[in-house]
UniProtKB/Swiss-Prot annotation:
Its EC number is 5.3.1.16. Belongs to the HisA/HisF family. It comes from the Bacteria. The lineage of its organism: Bacteria, Pseudomonadati, Pseudomonadota, Betaproteobacteria, Burkholderiales. This is 1-(5-phosphoribosyl)-5-[(5-phosphoribosylamino)methylideneamino] imidazole-4-carboxamide isomerase. GO terms for cellular component: cytoplasm.
Length: 265
């Protein structure tokens, strides 16, 4: 079970939003690359980036910050003899050229959210063009998928869409319960497990992680197909210590950094 720190980018800064509201942003760092280094030093083995301005604008808006983070990650990996630290990014990705540019910059995975729901043909093309590198981000409230930075609720059921996207060849699904994201109310374990059980590709949980108990609860059901969990406000505000939580997850999973790396080869 991987704990994946989230670095949400707004106006070049690292922030956290409450329930996706751009007007409720807390700035945690004016240097996102420094924040990336901090989480790597705390034991992160993968990073999750979100271009918040991009998600609302429908095109990349924080590319300089993304490049700076990727450079910091490369330097850290080289210095510590680590072959690769995967970095994934979502927010405002609506065309194949943008995906190609970001992958060339050094991203491992591209997350497609709103565009996957509104334009499934684009997702299909992306999965074909970049196999194994496309993740679908599904944000849901009460089992229904939300789009456009959570501002619109669609009529689509999460599981129906996820199965369709699995058929397209996406690498995994990030499932965010937007009723809980940034509120630290605990992960919606039941909904996450239900989704994971209906898929053969991995599910990454997101939204609501508050403390070590949430991590332990996810570890207890990880064999249903839950690969990791994205951590945001909890690690920034200190209700969850990333290093000790990842150590605990490794202990419960019977996995250490070495076996995790081997599993990803």
């Amino acid at each position: 079970m991987l704990l994946i720190p989230a670095i949400d980018l707004k106006d070049g800064h690292c922030v956290r939003l409450k329930q996706g509201d751009m007007d409720q942003a807390t700035v945690f760092s004016e240097d996102p690359a420094d924040m990336a280094r901090h989480w790597l030093e705390q034991g992160a083995r993968r990073l999750h980036l979100v271009d918040l301005n991009g998600a609302f604008a429908g095109k990349p808006k924080n590319e300089p910050a993304v490049k700076a983070i990727l450079q910091a990650v490369r330097e850290y990996a080289e210095k510590n003899g680590i072959e690769e630290i995967p970095v994934q990014l979502g927010g405002g990705i609506r065309d194949l050229d943008t995906i190609e540019r970001y992958l060339d910059d050094g991203l491992s995975y591209i997350i497609i959210g709103t565009a996957a729901v509104k334009n499934p043909g684009f997702l299909h093309d992306a999965c074909s063009a970049f196999p194994g590198q496309i993740i679908v981000g599904l944000d849901a409230k009460d089992g229904k998928v939300a789009t456009d930075g959570w501002s619109k609720l669609s009529g689509h059921e999460v599981i129906d869409l996820a199965k369709k996207f699995e058929d397209y060849g996406c690498e995994s699904i990030i499932y965010t319960d937007i009723g809980r994201d940034g509120m630290m109310g605990g992960v919606n374990i039941e909904a996450t497990v239900k989704l994971a059980q209906s898929m053969t590709i991995p599910v990454i949980a997101s939204g609501g992680v508050h403390n070590i108990k949430d991590v332990e609860a996810l570890c207890a059901v990880q064999e249903e197909g839950i690969e990791g969990v994205i951590c945001g406000r909890s690690i920034y505000e200190g209700t969850l210590d990333l290093r000790s939580a990842q150590d605990r997850a490794d202990e419960l999973s019977g996995v250490g950094p070495e076996t995790e790396a081997e599993a990803g080869e």
